């Protein structure tokens, strides 16, 4: 009883205050939703949404009043309320505060020295805030929006790493003693490990925070989202504000208007079309021109032809140079060597040939220049001025860039100048297989060396050591460079200096026209090679949702949904009367040619990789069985043909044939990917798009196509009749029945009735019988 009396007295005392009485009688104690959450066992279905709802209130958090007063944090800053002098009913000596109070504490509070560290920790979030400030909002339109759920990157990163690579980087950066054996990624990118260690050294950060920073710096945060339009990471982080099922908010995001981003996009597209043209055994130059003229890019809200963009740009990268040479456009006096861009400043060298021996057996020739020349070079963030003469790099000054970029730039300049011991004796690890491509083309020795330094960090440093190590002696334009690419090392590389700022590229008003060979080598009027396909960096898997590839050879570069549709459209166009068309190959039972059609090969990369062998076995069995029994539908054969390209392999089949984007087709069953109707066999629907099945001749009228069957009449369907091609009709005897493909997926049985008969009479009878049979 005494306990209840005590509670009653306390309640009476509290009710003396009007505000407290109202809270005790009308409202709830503290936040009801929070109270309910912590006093029930119900699992929160959407904790993220609840947190956002709670943080949207004016004062969603509480703070210690004494600490606020000691830190001299005002109640208001820049017209934004930070906290109010109202005690929280759930915790004594705490008052209500806003989220802005935390920002004030971090950047204007007593620990202001930590502000730079905080900006580094939340670098990705602050970057997102800055990008949102750059958005140019436009009109809001109401329309039906065709959205596709796709895996997209929601955060732009300077360098993208896989999850396993990020974990390796975290271990080797933070826990060197406990790190596992070095993976191939660590061996190839040890310079990045050292850079990260130096970046976070002597900073007041615990290892958990640094691990978080590393993950956010290299992880693009991929998500499956319903998207439309271009799928740049800068746009995907705002996709929720740019459109829904029935509305679109027009806006120019930071990534779309960024000049550097557009330049990188164009380089990626040019690299793709160059590599695709190089894969052609013959006429690579003409193929490249076809690919360029059939491609367009979206710049903001405008669709522009790739051909125009290439001719307008002043980019001197090797991929753009090759494309511009193919189009006959003028260029400045520039050249490229691998991923390094070069521009000659002065001098004119004379070519001299020399020989180096591979494994002491095979002699390989290479060229060098006997006269002195000066060049400007650029690789990623590093730039350089250097001079070459004979087989040596006389001197080099490197400006700007991180240590790793400076090292790689120096190594490429050494190879370009044929400097170092490895142009006298080849490295022992270079084998005969490194001297040619998969297609059997010979690789020049300088490019063999370029590939060699890319294989491991040890190879790169071995080449740099061949430059020669001397006591540190600062140069005129900057400090000496050590073997690790840093300044003011105890031991430095011979005649290599560093300056803090970047070196500006010298202007060149003189324009030249380059010729492009079928080997995709661009050379000037004197025969000097300016760029070659070997200069292109290794291909990366990049998808282009804001680029339109119209050429059928480039179908695999489109987004997968469009590529599947275009692939089926190309297969349907093969339903003709030619010897190499699908009906003729079926009639001849030439399965090998059927499975290796160019259209089938183009769709091969769209098949789920880990199941392609199993799908091929099932699809080939379906095709051969149906053709052998004579009970088949051309529509169904077209559906499974893309899955027949690969070598068959035993395995469990689930009943569906999946593409790599998780869409699928099912034999004998219509779905949104591939569907057709027996009532109207003239059309096939792929992803809702109607594709017309062609007739056997280039005529739009069914009756005139039958005029070619003079001496035959349509009869009742006979599955026992042999399937023949149009060319084999001359061998059919009087009274014999044959089956023939007549167009739009239809197969009819014909009987030889006479050796000669008026075509018009046959047409009238045949048309009537076909209409009756339908």
Swiss-Prot record:
Q: Which UniProt keywords apply?
A: Cap snatching, Eukaryotic host gene expression shutoff by virus, Eukaryotic host transcription shutoff by virus, Host gene expression shutoff by virus, Host nucleus, Host-virus interaction, Inhibition of host RNA polymerase II by virus, mRNA capping, mRNA processing, Viral transcription, Virion
Q: Which domain of life is it from?
A: Viruses
- Asked if Repeat is a keyword of the record, the answer is no
Give the disulfide map: none
**Localization per Swiss-Prot or TrEMBL:** Virion; Host nucleus
Q: Does the keyword ATP-binding apply?
A: no
InterPro entries, from UniProt? Flu_PB2_2nd, Flu_PB2_6th, Flu_PB2_C, Flu_PB2_CAP-bd, Flu_PB2_middle, Flu_PB2_N, INV_PB2, PB2_helical
Which regions span the lipid bilayer?
A: none
Q: Which GO terms describe its molecular function?
A: RNA binding; RNA-directed RNA polymerase activity
What Gene Ontology biological process does one annotation of this record name? DNA-templated transcription
| Role played | Plays an essential role in transcription initiation and cap-stealing mechanism, in which cellular capped pre-mRNAs are used to generate primers for viral transcription. Recognizes and binds a wide range of cap structures of target pre-RNAs which are subsequently cleaved after 10-13 nucleotides by the viral protein PA. Plays a role in the initiation of the viral genome replication and modulates the activity of the ribonucleoprotein (RNP) complex.
Its quaternary organisation is: Influenza RNA polymerase is composed of three subunits: PB1, PB2 and PA. Interacts (via N-terminus) with PB1 (via C-terminus). Interacts with nucleoprotein NP (via N-terminus).
Its family? Belongs to the influenza viruses PB2 family.
Q: What is this protein called?
A: Polymerase basic protein 2
Organism encoding this protein: Influenza C virus (strain C/Ann Arbor/1/1950)
Q: What is the lineage of its organism?
A: Viruses, Riboviria, Orthornavirae, Negarnaviricota, Polyploviricotina
């Amino acid at each position: 009883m005494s306990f209840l009396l005590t509670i009653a007295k306390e309640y009476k005392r509290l009710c003396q205050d009007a505000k407290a009485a109202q809270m005790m009688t009308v409202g709830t104690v503290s936040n009801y939703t929070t109270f309910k959450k912590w006093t029930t066992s119900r699992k929160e279905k959407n904790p993220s949404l609840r947190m956002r709802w709670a943080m949207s209130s004016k004062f969603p958090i509480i703070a210690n009043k004494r600490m606020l007063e000691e830190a001299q944090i005002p109640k208001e800053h820049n017209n934004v309320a930070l906290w109010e002098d109202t005690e929280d009913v759930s915790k004594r000596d705490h008052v209500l505060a806003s989220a802005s109070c935390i920002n004030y504490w971090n950047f204007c509070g007593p620990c202001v020295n930590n502000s730079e560290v905080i900006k580094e920790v939340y670098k990705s979030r602050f970057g997102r805030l800055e990008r949102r400030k750059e958005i140019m909002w436009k009109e809001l339109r109401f329309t039906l929006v065709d959205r596709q759920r796709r895996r997209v990157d929601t955060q732009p990163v300077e360098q993208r790493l896989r999850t396993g690579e990020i974990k390796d980087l975290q271990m080797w950066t933070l826990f060197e003693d406990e790190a596992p054996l070095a993976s191939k990624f660590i061996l190839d990118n040890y310079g990045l490990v050292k850079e990260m260690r130096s970046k976070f050294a002597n900073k007041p950060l615990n290892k958990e925070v640094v691990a978080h920073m590393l993950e956010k710096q290299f992880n693009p945060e991929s998500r499956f989202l319903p998207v439309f339009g271009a799928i740049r990471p800068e746009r995907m982080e705002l996709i929720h504000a740019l459109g829904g099922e029935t509305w679109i908010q027009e806006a120019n995001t930071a990534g779309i208007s960024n000049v550097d981003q557009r330049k990188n996009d164009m380089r990626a597209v040019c690299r793709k079309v160059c590599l695709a043209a190089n894969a052609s055994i013959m006429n690579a130059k003409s193929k490249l021109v076809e690919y360029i003229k059939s491609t367009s890019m979206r710049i903001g809200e405008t669709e522009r032809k790739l051909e125009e963009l290439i001719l307008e740009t002043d980019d001197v990268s090797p991929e753009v140079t090759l494309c511009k040479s193919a189009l006959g456009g003028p260029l400045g006096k520039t050249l490229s060597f691998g991923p390094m861009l070069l521009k000659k400043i002065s001098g004119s060298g004379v070519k001299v040939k020399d020989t180096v021996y591979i494994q002491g057996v095979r002699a390989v020739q290479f060229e060098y220049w006997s006269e002195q020349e000066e060049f400007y070079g650029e690789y990623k963030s590093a730039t350089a001025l250097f001079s070459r003469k004979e087989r040596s790099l006389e001197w080099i000054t490197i400006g700007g860039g991180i240590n790793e970029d400076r090292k790689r730039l120096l190594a490429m300049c050494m190879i370009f100048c044929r400097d170092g011991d490895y142009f006298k004796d080849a490295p022992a690890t270079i084998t005969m297989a490194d001297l040619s491509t998969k297609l059997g083309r010979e690789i020049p020795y300088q490019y063999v060396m370029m590939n060699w330094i890319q294989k491991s960090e040890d190879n790169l440093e071995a080449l740099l050591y061949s430059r020669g190590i001397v006591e540190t002696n600062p140069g005129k334009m900057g400090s000496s460079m050590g073997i690790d690419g840093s300044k003011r090392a105890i031991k430095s590389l011979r005649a290599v200096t560093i300056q803090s700022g970047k070196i500006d590229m010298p202007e060149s008003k003189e324009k030249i026209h380059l010729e492009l060979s079928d080997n995709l080598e661009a050379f000037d009027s004197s025969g000097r090679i300016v760029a070659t396909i070997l200069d292109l960096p290794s291909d990366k898997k990049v998808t282009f949702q804001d680029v339109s590839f119209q050429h059928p050879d480039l179908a695999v570069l489109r987004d997968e949904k469009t590529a599947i549709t275009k692939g089926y459209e190309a297969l349907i166009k093969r339903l003709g009367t030619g010897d190499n068309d699908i009906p003729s190959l079926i009639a001849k039972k030439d399965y090998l040619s059927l499975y290796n059609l160019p259209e089938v090969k183009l769709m091969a990369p769209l098949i789920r990789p880990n199941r392609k062998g199993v799908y091929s076995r099932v699809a080939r069995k379906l095709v051969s069985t149906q053709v052998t029994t004579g009970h088949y539908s051309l529509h169904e054969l077209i559906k499974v043909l893309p899955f027949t390209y690969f070598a068959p392999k035993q395995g469990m089949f689930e009943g569906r044939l999946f593409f790599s984007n998780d869409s699928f087709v099912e034999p004998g069953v219509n779905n949104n990917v591939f569907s057709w109707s027996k009532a109207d066999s003239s059309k096939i629907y792929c992803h809702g798009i109607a594709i017309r099945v062609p007739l056997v001749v280039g005529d739009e009228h069914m009756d005139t196509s039958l005029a070619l069957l003079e001496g035959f009449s349509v009869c009742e369907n006979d599955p026992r009749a042999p399937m023949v091609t149009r060319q084999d009709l001359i061998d059919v005897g009087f009274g014999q029945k044959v089956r023939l493909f007549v167009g739009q997926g239809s197969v009819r049985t014909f009987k030889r009735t006479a050796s000669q008969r008026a075509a018009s009479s046959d047409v009238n009878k045949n048309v009537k019988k076909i209409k009756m049979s339908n």
